[in-house]
Amino acid sequence: EQMGVQVVTLWLLSTDNLSRDPAELSPLLDIIAHAVDELAETGRWRLRLVGAVDLLPEPLAERLRAAVARSQPPEAKAEGKKGEVVDPEDRPMQVNIAVGYGGRQEIADAVRELLRERAAAGASLEEVAASLSEEDITDHLYTKGQPDPDLVIRTSGEQRLSGFLLWQSVHSEYYFCEVNWPAFRRVDFLRALRDFASRERRLGR
């Protein structure tokens, strides 16, 4: 918030993680639920679930949805009164909680939702294929309505993307950090921002 960041996405659990042994997965799910509850209770940020929530155990999915609901500001504060436009600077920071998230899964879900929407409107498959655009898919992603990430921080020293925000990160800058996520400190974040600020972004040009 102090650095003017408007949107942050925390990837807490991938779709691949869901195939772990139950004895290993259960404690991890408890940790995630507790962490999201704590984020919601602060009242400082708007939370949004990003992922295939239907793949999660139902008790966890319900708990996460409840936490997200608690984090939403009053309508008057979020949208303004009587049509008043609210300055984006006055809105709480958006924190995306990526749980049950996979980049390929997100794109598949976006295309599936788009096809269902067009079919309900009476369009044929041929008509959908003829008119399909990148913007159509973007508008059906989990993060629809949000800007693409400027910076992706990969912790734990791994030199791979693991499918994180595959569609959205086409022009993102990447920063690889040796520190594991639970030990990630403010100073590590500031180093990442400093490194990012020193780069000349070409945005595909």
Describe every region a protein language model picked out.
Residues 1-205:
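Flexible, compositionally biased loop and terminal segments
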